Amino acid sequence: MTSLSWQQTLSAMDVDDIVSLLAAAERADGTGPVSEDVRLALRPGLRIGAGRHLLAVSAAADTSGPNVPDTPGDQNAADTSTMPGRVPAGRIIGYAHLGGVDQARQAEVVVHPDHRGRGVGTALVGGLTEALAAPSSRLDIWAHGDLPAAAALATRLTFTRTRVLLQLRRPLAAGTPLPDPRLPAGVTVRTFVPDQDDRAWLAVNAAAFADHPEQGRWTLDDLARRRAEPWFDPRGFFLAEHDGALVGFHWTKVHETDQTPPRNAQPGPIGEVYVVGVLPGAGGAGLGRALTLIGLRHLQAEGLDSVLLYVDEDNVRAVRMYTGLGFITYVRDVSYHWERPSTG
């Protein structure tokens, strides 16, 4: 049997189990199963806003029942089988994170590869929808990698595909040509100074991503959590100024290991165009492209052989700019939307 448990915070053992679960899913699927926001929430005792964790826990170490497919409306029956001997009793075999605000919740769901097809995913999604308090609640669940199994489950549970996030990549090895960045007249670029630039950067970030459901909502705490990460390096965080005011930025990131390298490639470090933003109506034409190139040149000088970035598929202007700089689509993440049926 499998039991579901809601947690406001996680124990150290919970975190270890979830991290192992994520690693197993990543090996099986070839893509990371959760976002950076969720990974940053996986800290013992940490509570972030209204975020909550839903754990699917194996209640028996060894069962002999047949595989049962995910079947809506029969969650208890669907959870009666686990892989014999694979996961001890009390270990986490499925995980969901619920965030966002009351009437517009966002979630991510992952099931251990050895326990798929047994109703765990259906049970987790059912637990998420049941937890929504408001009568008009809406829920968006991210499925990383656009996997067929996730699409099939979403269809069965009446979720609608609404948003696609592209991961783009391009080579960056020494000698790979990059155009010269051309800054608009009067614009200068320097690197980020922690504490000094935090609030100014947050203001420009919020304005640049006013219509973005995640990036535009960043707070000082969100920035502080990332500054505390081992990958944070202000030398790769570029700020554009005009007349002393911040008008744009390019924050780069270096991953120690590419968790989803191309097939038959040895995993190594990879750079990331973490976030590029320009203050609306400021800075002049071409500032976003120039900032992108400045960051790419920095990553190339750091010895990175390739670079990735994430962009919404419907952000046609940004996609056009990135493809014009040699980026191609590597993987897709999909958001599925659900609304509580009207009772009227």
From Swiss-Prot:
PROSITE patterns: GNAT
Keyword Transferase tagged: yes
Gene3D superfamilies xrefs: 3.40.630.30
Residue span, N-acetyltransferase domain: 40-179, 187-344
UniProtKB keywords: Acyltransferase, Repeat, Transferase
Location of region: Disordered: 61-83
EC number assigned by the record: 2.3.1.189
Binding residues annotated for 1D-myo-inositol 2-(L-cysteinylamino)-2-deoxy-alpha-D-glucopyranoside, in chain numbering: 36, 214, 253, 272, 310
Residues involved in acetyl-CoA 1 binding: 109-111
An annotated GO BP: mycothiol biosynthetic process
Family, per entry: Belongs to the acetyltransferase family. MshD subfamily.
Subunit: Monomer.
Name under which the protein is recorded: Mycothiol acetyltransferase
Organism name: Frankia casuarinae (strain DSM 45818 / CECT 9043 / HFP020203 / CcI3)
